[in-house]
Design a protein with these regions (language model features):
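RNA-interacting cores
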Residues: 1-214
Length: 214
């Protein structure tokens, strides 16, 4: 006689995902400054023990490539190229940095001991991990920075006034409700901010609009 095998049927339950568009508005200026291509090449050359290039670096390449760009990195490294990019392209903040600040706010404001639950309950959906900003004015600030070794170096920082950004979040609502998520984002904007120069008060923001989309 053949053997009868009992099989356990597992029911796969779908996750009830919900979505919302969040708009954050700056409470002051934001400074955006990632490692630019000029510095990156210099570091690579130093590691390869290449002779130093005595030719003066292109300041516009430094300014332009120190930003994340939504529609790809511009190739015209000139003043006109920057002006065109600011009109036709869009500088960005990163979804990674934004979500990290949310998780940090959860811990710092003692909402939870760890940020794991929040991280697992909410995602930011962004093309290429980038969130474009809108702004009213752009400035290039020149500052002397003192590295740990060597002489002070001149750096150029992109600063934006009247900025805002809209991004889409995906959440389950099982651990953190949309109201709690909104509260966390506002706490992150007030106490942490986004971008460079946050210890100097740059990059602070608040939520200006929430739109449920599913």
């Amino acid at each position: 006689m053949g053997k009868t095998t009992d099989r356990e049927v597992l029911e796969l339950k779908s996750i009830n995902l919900q979505y919302a568009n969040i708009t954050i508005a700056g409470d002051g200026d934001i400074v955006l400054n990632k490692m630019n291509d000029v510095v990156s090449r210099q570091l690579i050359d130093a590691r390869k023990d290449k002779a130093k290039d005595l030719e003066k670096s292109n300041e516009w390449e430094e300014i332009i490539t120190s930003l994340h760009w939504f529609n790809g990195k511009p190739t015209d490294f000139s003043k006109k190229g920057l002006e065109k990019a600011l009109k036709e392209n869009a500088p960005c903040i990163t979804a990674f940095g934004l979500k990290k600040s949310f998780g940090d706010a959860v811990v710092r404001n003692e909402i939870d001991k760890y940020k794991t639950k929040f991280d697992n309950g909410m995602n930011i959906i962004a093309k290429g991990g980038l969130i474009p900003i809108k702004f009213t004015e752009h400035f290039v600030d020149e500052k002397l920075m003192s590295p740990m070794k060597g002489k002070p170096v001149l750096v150029r920082l992109n600063r934006f006034s009247g900025w805002e950004a809209t991004f889409t979040i995906q959440y389950t609502g099982s651990v953190y409700s949309i109201e709690q998520i909104i509260n966390v984002i506002n706490l992150a904007g007030f106490g942490l901010g986004i971008g460079s120069g946050r210890t100097s008060g740059y990059g602070r923001y608040h939520i200006s609009n929430v739109e449920a989309i599913g």
